[in-house]
Amino acid sequence: MIKIIRKIGFFLLICFVLAISCSPATETDTQTKSFTKSFLWEVSSDVNTIYILGSVHVAEANIYPLNDVIEDAYDQSAIIVAEIDITNISEEELGMLLMEKGMYPAGESLETHISSELYSRVSERILELDPTGFLLSYANVFEPWVVAVTITDFDYMQLGYDAEYGIDLYFLEKANTDGKQVLEFESAEFQLGLFDSLSDEIQIMMLEDAIDNPVTKAEMEDLFTAWNTGDASTMELLVFEGIEEHPEYQRLYNKIIDDRNFLMVEKIETYLQGNVIHFVVVGAGHLVGDNGIINLLDEKGYDTLQL
C-alpha cells in the first residue's frame, strides 16, 4: 500500500510552488495508454473563454518545447494567472519569510524537537548531501518541513529536475518578456504559512519520508507521463487514492487542497464574467478530483473542454 504521507508530498509537488516530494508510482500502467490531450482545459461562460493549465513545479530541460496547443492558448491570452508570482519576489524577501515561518526561536532547534534516533538519521542523510557539515548546521535551526523540503530539493536536482524548468516559472518569465499582465491567487507568505501551520506530527512524518523514501527517477517519469499525455485519471489516483481510509489526512487535504480550490474558483468566475482571456497556471493536482477546479467549474454550469 502506498504510504499516505507520500501522497501528501506528491500533492505538494504539483500544487505548491514551494514543493517537496513525489508519490511512488501506482499500479496503473501509464505507458500502455494512448492519450492525445494535454493537461490544459478551455473553460467558457456565455461571455468569455479562459484557459487553465496544470503545472508541475520542477522539471527537466527536455520538457520543452511544450505542446503547441498550450503555447497557442498562452498566445491568445492577455493576462497570466499563477498561484504566486515567483518572479516578483527576491531571494532576500523569500529568505526573510522562510526565517519567519520556518525557523525555531533562539534556544530551540530541530535536534531538541525530534527524537535522537530520527535526528541521527537526518544528520546522516544531510552529511551524504554535504560532507562539509555546513548544510547540517543550517538545517538544525529550521522546523521539520523546511528540512524535508531541503532534502527533497537535493533529490530533484540529483535526478536532473529543477524549479528552473518548472512550467509555472516558464510562463511567468515568458509573460514578463512579452509584457503581459500577471496576477496571482496567493502569496509566498500564504503558502509558507500553510506549511508552517501543519502539526508537528505531520511535519515529522514528512521529514521521515524525505529520509526513508528518496525520490526516484521512475516516480518522476510516471508523473510526467501522466502530465504529458493529459492523463487526468492517473493524476487523480496519484493524488487521492486511499486518502478516504485515513480521516486525519482527509482533514489535511481539505485544508491544503479543497479550501484553496474553492477560493481559486471564486476568482476564476470573475474572469469568466469579463471580456479578457486569462491563462491560468496552477499545480496539476488542483485540477483533478471531485473538488478539483475543473469539476467545480463544470458543476457551476461552465463548459469545460480538455485540449
Regions found by a protein language model. Give the residues of each.
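A cross-kingdom marker for long, charged
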Residues: 250-307
